[in-house]
Amino acid sequence: MCQQVVVVANTNNKMKTSYSIKQVLKTLFKKQQKQQQKPQGSLESLESVDNLRNAQVEEAYYAEIDENAANEKLAQLAHSQEFEIVEEQEDEEDVYVPVRFARTTAGTFFWTTNLQPVASVEPAMCYSMQFQDRWAQA
């Protein structure tokens, strides 16, 4: 009889170990199922965060486009004003400078002078003896 009790005790131990393995496996599976369910919820939250970020980026792009459009209009306005100023300055700065040339056996020589027309020539005593002609050989 003693042997049977020992065997029964051994079977109880075997049952206990299998029972404990089952319990451990059940808890593992439950934890795994809970962890799988949590990412689904977090995926939804990640998706909403991603949508929010996309909306913010889109708003930033639209704001930048509006700002660039305004800046382009300002740049065009400034450019047109600069162009008008440059045209006015060119009109004011256009000075006719006669170019004179002479062909010789040594080559063709070109020169300019800053002498005024004959009507506005001052008396000869006001002129200095420094030559102000510019010349170059072609």
Swiss-Prot record:
Keyword Signal belongs to the record: no
Highest taxon, organism lineage: Eukaryota
Record Pfam families: ESM4 (PF15952)
Any one Gene Ontology BP term: Notch signaling pathway
Cysteines engaged in disulfide bonds, as pairs: none
Keyword match Hydrolase: no
Entry keyword set: Notch signaling pathway
MF annotations from Gene Ontology: ubiquitin protein ligase binding
Protein purpose: Part of the Notch signaling pathway.
Record family assignment: Belongs to the M4-like protein family.
Name this protein carries in UniProt: Enhancer of split malpha protein
Species in which this protein is naturally found: Drosophila melanogaster
Lineage of the species this protein comes from: Eukaryota, Metazoa, Ecdysozoa, Arthropoda, Hexapoda
